[in-house]
Amino acid sequence: MIRKLEEKDITTIVELEEKIFGETLGVEMLHSELSNPLVWFRVIENENQVIGYIGGYFYDGAGEIINFLIDDIYQRKGYGTLLFNSLIEESRAAGIKQITLEVKETNIKGINFYTKNEFKQISVRKHYYKDGENALVMMKEIKWKY
């Protein structure tokens, strides 16, 4: 089941971020973003347990994914695709024309997923992450369904 991120999910999301990324957006940021009308956060559940989430901003006809993760034991089982497709459909409905994101250049699984979903690399942000790693900036044009 895919639904909006709720206050009760924040602890689980922070734990998943630490587990998967080794860092987190943090409890305070997630709390503050819940009330931001430009922010879009969705979680995906399996048997009433949050196993992943996607979050981003929609503004001026554009979107930006700020975080996307699926618990490692649920990866490569279709959950990420379901969650990602929900973002694309809501983007399309909101009139979003393109979506951008940053991904660590060593995150091969992530890069492959985004490439499979029609994202193209448009630039590199040198030493973008806290650990000094570069970020690949990727973009997807949102196509309208007729």
Predicted regions and their residues:
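Short Asp/Glu-rich motifs
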Residues: 36, 110, 133-134
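Short aromatic/hydrophobic contact patches that present stacked aromatics
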Residues: 69, 100-102, 137-139
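Acyl-donor (CoA/ACP) binding surface of acyl/acetyltransferases
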Residues: 74-77, 81, 126, 134-136, ...
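Conserved glycine-rich acetyl-CoA-binding loop
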Residues: 49, 71-85, 92-94, 98, ...
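Conserved catalytic-core motifs of GNAT/GCN5-like acyltransferases
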Residues: 102, 115, 120-136
